[in-house]
Curated annotation (Swiss-Prot):
Subunit structure: Binds to single-stranded and double-stranded viral DNA. Interacts with the host nuclear shuttle interacting (NSI) protein. This interaction may allow NSP to recruit NSI monomers to the viral genome and thus regulate nuclear export of viral genome by NSP.
Gene3D superfamilies found in the cross-reference section: 2.60.120.20
Residue ranges of the motif Bipartite nuclear localization signal: 21-42
Region (Interaction with Arabidopsis thaliana NSI protein): 150-187
Family named by the database record: Belongs to the begomovirus nuclear shuttle protein family.
The protein's name: Nuclear shuttle protein
Upper classification of the organism: Viruses, Monodnaviria, Shotokuvirae, Cressdnaviricota, Repensiviricetes
Keyword Transport: yes
Cellular compartments per GO CC: host cell; host cell cytoplasm; host cell nucleus; host cell plasma membrane; membrane; viral capsid
UniProt keyword terms in alphabetical order: DNA-binding, Host cell membrane, Host cytoplasm, Host membrane, Host nucleus, Host-virus interaction, Membrane, Transport, Viral movement protein
One Pfam family this sequence matches: Gemini_coat
Amino acid sequence: MYSTRFRRGLSYVPRRYNPRNYGFKRTFVVKRGDAKRRQTQVKKLTEDVKMSSQRIHENQYGPEFVMAHNTAISTFINYPQLCKTQPNRSRSYIKLKSLHFKGTLKIERVGSEVNMAGLNPKIEGVFTVVLVVDRKPHLNPTGNLLQFDELFGARIHSLGNLAVTPALKERFYILHVLKRVISVEKDSMMLDLEGSTCLSSRRYNCWSTFKDLDPSSCNGVYDNISKNAILVYYCWMSDAMSKASTFVSFDLDYFG
């Protein structure tokens, strides 16, 4: 007769230790994937921490925010990290409440351009700041953010009413547009930039989620955001040889 020791539910003999069986089980657990265990570890680190209303501050300035005439640049708003030091987040998601920005724009003449009367012509142009929500964030095939022309059709469209191209309307929507029409005879001038917009209201909540694949990547950069990233586009359109430089501070109010 066969022993009932290996038949489920029929044996009352205590199971003896078998090194081969236990070693096999350990190998099986590892093969199920380290990613799930890392995500579980990330979740356990913060599951006991309460969510709270906070604000994260960011300054955008420097050489990468200097534009020649008839050019545009694209960037994004950094979100909080999953950590213990505020401003932070305690989950793999946050509620976006509102976004405020304030800063300065400097327009400068480049080179010596003289008109028929022997005078420097006016610097005339339009500077635009556009805030855009990216519902399904991912980099383009070249590893970069979507450029101004790709999203809005052409930079010259900033002179009128901007609209997302039809093919991208399901993924992107315009959150806020700020325009400054400039006409100056001097070689340089400075202007104030200021604006604010609400992302959540009593009728609608805007949530952003994060990939957080492992503890080392639980940051707030665009590549780790899986839903509702905020992109910022700056565009300077002018026929005059000139450049535009910005220093803009952003304050994001959120619950997380």
